[in-house]
């Protein structure tokens, strides 16, 4: 029986979707942390972001204590020295290539 059937537990059910490529720009060190976290879970970056968004939309925390500790380590390794209070306050800077 297909996992999208009704006799499957909610955690085993699958959802057919159509994915699209997006051209989003994000802060460089945040992307490094997200990529490392996706690699840690052995999932794609897109899958990780989808999970974070779905949890946020449902007003749930996407990560447990163990993962939050891992994120703190990754933030330190990749120089992500800010938290949620920086939301919507980033100022775009010219890249090294753009400065000449």
What are these model-predicted stretches?
Residues 1-17:
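Arg/Lys-rich, low-complexity, intrinsically disordered N-terminal tails that contact nucleic acids
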Residues 58-100:
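Short, positively charged interaction helices/loops
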Residues 38:
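The alpha-helix within a helix-turn-helix
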Residues 41-68:
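Short, basic amphipathic alpha-helical segments that act as recognition/interaction helices
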Residues 14, 29, 52, 99-100:
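Intrinsically disordered, low-complexity regions of eukaryotic proteins
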Residues 18-34:
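Short amphipathic alpha-helix starts
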Residues 30-33, 45, 70:
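Amphipathic alpha-helical interface surfaces
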């Amino acid at each position: 029986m297909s996992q999208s059937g009704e006799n499957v537990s909610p955690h085993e059910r699958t959802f057919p979707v159509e994915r699209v490529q997006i051209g989003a720009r994000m802060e460089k060190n945040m992307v490094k942390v997200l990529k490392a976290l996706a690699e840690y879970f052995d999932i794609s970056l897109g899958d990780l972001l989808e999970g974070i968004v779905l949890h946020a939309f449902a007003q749930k925390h996407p990560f447990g204590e163990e993962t939050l500790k891992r994120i703190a380590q990754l933030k330190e390794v990749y120089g992500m020295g800010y938290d949620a209070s920086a939301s919507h306050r980033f100022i775009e800077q010219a890249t090294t290539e753009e400065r000449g």
